[in-house]
Every structure is written in structure tokens, then in C-alpha cells.
Amino acid sequence: MPKMKSNKGASKRFKKTAGGIKFKHATKRHILTKRTTKNKRQLRPNSLLPKCEVAAVARMLPYA
């Protein structure tokens, strides 16, 4: 049986840890002058994926 392929987009965006699947928030690259300081601060830390999306991402990353 051939090896399963990982989804390359998902492998660059998500990291599996003991606590769950970690991801970085979007909209933090450029044009940040429109955003409030509070909003930028809330987007700063990495977060864990919600339970409802874990199964879908896990299917995309069979070897993670």
C-alpha cells in the first residue's frame, strides 16, 4: 500500500502537540495600522484548534 500524502498547506499551518493542534492567527502580516492595539494583542499568541475542527485537520496530517 502506498504512503499517504500530507496536505502541504495544512502541514505549514498546524503543529500537533500533546495538548492539541496549534495554529497561528491570521491577519497579522501587514496593514496593521487599521487594527486596534487590543485586537493585535489578542491575535498574538498561538491557539489550540477547536474540538470540532480537530478531526478534519488530523485527516490532512496522517503522520503528525
UniProtKB/Swiss-Prot annotation:
GO terms of molecular function? structural constituent of ribosome
Protein name according to UniProt: Large ribosomal subunit protein bL35
An example GO CC term for this entry is:
cytosolic large ribosomal subunit
Q: Which InterPro entries match?
A: Ribosomal_bL35 (IPR001706), Ribosomal_bL35-like (IPR021137), Ribosomal_bL35_CS (IPR018265), Ribosomal_bL35_sf (IPR037229)
- Family assignment from sequence similarity: Belongs to the bacterial ribosomal protein bL35 family.
Q: Which organism is it from?
A: Aliivibrio fischeri (strain ATCC 700601 / ES114) (Vibrio fischeri)
Keyword annotations of the record = Ribonucleoprotein, Ribosomal protein
Signal peptide positions are none
Keyword Ribonucleoprotein, does the record have it? yes
Asked whether the keyword Transferase is assigned, the reply is: no
Q: What is the lineage of its organism?
A: Bacteria, Pseudomonadati, Pseudomonadota, Gammaproteobacteria, Vibrionales
Which terms under GO biological process does the entry name?
translation
Lineage: superkingdom: Bacteria
